[in-house]
A protein has these predicted regions:
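Non-catalytic substrate-recognition and accessory regions of acyl/acetyltransferase enzymes
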Residues: 1-226
Length: 226
């Protein structure tokens, strides 16, 4: 009985915290990249993001593809419920959410003010049936986690409808880009033909895009953050 009550209590606490989660898309993605909307502009992996002061148009490729790219955010505790939804002006954490061509919803690297919120994001992903990165880094070859399930990810693709843009964001995981067909991937591909298509790599933080022929298999900028 004590175990059951403890379990119910934990579920209740999680449900209360989950109220503060939201999934946004379009121009709201660039909004919540901005440091002015962070709970703290200088603390945690969120406050240390290298993209926090970048202009909104750097994120156009996200905003123009809402069916493929969204963002999961955790609001701070200073908000309020309006029309049944919790809203606040500041966020405690964020992570991109990718709708892959392979059918998996994958939550990317989690940027948070507090380390403990990483586990909350993983639980929120599990609740929604999404996969997430087991380790919070910029590795393209990663282990994907969903609750107790784990799998080694070799090759995901994200086919974009709108990809003609002048500026590009730094991307942690799905950084390989086929500009001819508008496809993002966490790998240059499984065949030589695939590798010849992924000619670009989103590893720069100044709005430009790198060429893969100058990059090694994992990307030279794996320690940068998004």
């Amino acid at each position: 009985e004590m175990f059951v009550n403890s379990y119910k209590s934990e579920i209740g606490l999680l449900n209360n915290v989950f109220i503060r989660f939201d999934v946004v898309e379009g121009d709201l993605i660039s909004k919540f990249y901005k440091a002015s909307n962070y709970y703290s502009e200088s603390s945690g992996t969120l406050g240390n993001s290298c993209m926090k002061y970048k202009p909104s148009y750097y994120f156009d490729i996200y905003a123009k593809n809402p069916e493929k790219i969204k963002m999961v955010i955790l609001y701070d505790e200073d908000g309020q419920i309006s029309d049944g939804k919790y809203k606040s002006n500041k966020i405690m954490a964020r992570a991109l959410l990718w709708n892959t061509d392979q059918g998996d919803m994958v939550m990317d690297r989690i940027y948070s003010y507090q380390d403990k919120d990483v586990e909350l994001f993983k639980r929120f992903a599990e609740k929604n049936g999404w996969w997430c990165k087991k380790t919070q880094d910029s590795e393209c070859n990663f282990i994907s986690q969903r609750g107790e399930e784990n799998k080694k990810v070799k090759y995901y693709t994200i086919s974009l409808k709108e990809f003609d843009t002048e500026y590009y964001p730094y991307v942690d995981t799905f950084a390989y880009f086929d500009p001819k067909n508008g496809i993002l991937s966490n790998s240059q591909g499984l065949t030589d033909k695939d590798k010849s298509n992924y000619t670009h790599y989103m590893s720069n933080t100044d709005g430009t895009i790198a060429m893969t022929r100058y990059m090694d298999g994992d990307g030279d900028d794996e320690d940068d953050d998004n």
